[in-house]
């Protein structure tokens, strides 16, 4: 909790302690922010959830495979693969949209999800393009802008139901 007499300073503190996001959808950060919102109770619940982590990852892996089987049948769409040398936690299901083959681009597909009231999001803005980091050293990352413009994260909650997946697939198949 933050207490202040100055409303502007209070607003600034809240802004900085909630990641300093200026655009929730595209993860735009014009200042360096922090994520200082974990209470002791939330920390205890998080530790208790760790016991379920292997089962959660297994469910998310299974759902990823189900999505992938269907999405592989749609020209111009593909879920990013997990390389053989990696062990993924399947946190996100990142959909690569090839506009030429699919017929519409990532942003138009995002609007279709929004119209269907299904949450989907672009991947995070590239750090080296964010205002606080523009003047910092960055490695050569020639492929990153290509992927940034073409990836959409689709619903991937551990509690995702078959019916919800079906709704996502209906949107993907309707172009």
Residues of each region from the PLM?
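Glycine-rich phosphate-binding loop of ATP-grasp-fold ATP-dependent ligases
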Residues: 1-2
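PLP-dependent aminotransferase class I/II
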Residues: 5-175
